[in-house]
Amino acid sequence: MASRVLSAYVSRLPAAFAPLPRVRMLAVARPLSTALCSAGTQTRLGPLQPALVLAQVPGRVTQLCRQYSDMPPLTLEGIQDRVLYVLKLYDKIDPEKLSVNSHFMKDLGLDSLDQVEIIMAMEDEFGFEIPDIDAEKLMCPQEIVDYIADKKDVYE
């Protein structure tokens, strides 16, 4: 029984390593260029999307691509909401005392280690590192909002 299974597997092995059929390339679209979607509408590719390759298949054109999901654009209001949300989840902050202009040490009674933990939470939330020199200056939620908006080029 085992020999039959092994021989069947070995007989199919050359087919598994056969070269793929050659396909003529029609176009290569670079990021930030306009391309046709499968629905037939034109879309604008974002900067995080890889190059798009169109291949000719008899009878129709097929789009071969990999697209990454993109976050909706940031706004000052959205940044502020996310900053306050992260701060409200921090166990040493009383959500009732928290406002956009609350000073971490004077108003909320936090120490420097708490401030470092807050900055680390903001780095995780927004996906980029805040240098220590800049982090030392961020002492209230509004300063964090302004800093993130400046780094992410968000202006209203």
Curated annotation (Swiss-Prot):
Instruction: Provide one Gene Ontology cellular component.
Output: respiratory chain complex I
Transmembrane segment boundaries: none
Q: N6-acetyllysine modification sites?
A: K88
Give the record's keywords alphabetically. Acetylation, Electron transport, Fatty acid biosynthesis, Fatty acid metabolism, Lipid biosynthesis, Lipid metabolism, Mitochondrion, Phosphopantetheine, Phosphoprotein, Respiratory chain, Transit peptide, Transport
> Which modifications occur after translation, per UniProt?
Phosphopantetheinylation at Ser-112 is essential for interactions with LYR motif-containing proteins.
Return the similarity comment. Answer: Belongs to the acyl carrier protein (ACP) family.
| Name of the protein in question | Acyl carrier protein, mitochondrial
Q: Which organism is it from?
A: Pongo pygmaeus (Bornean orangutan)
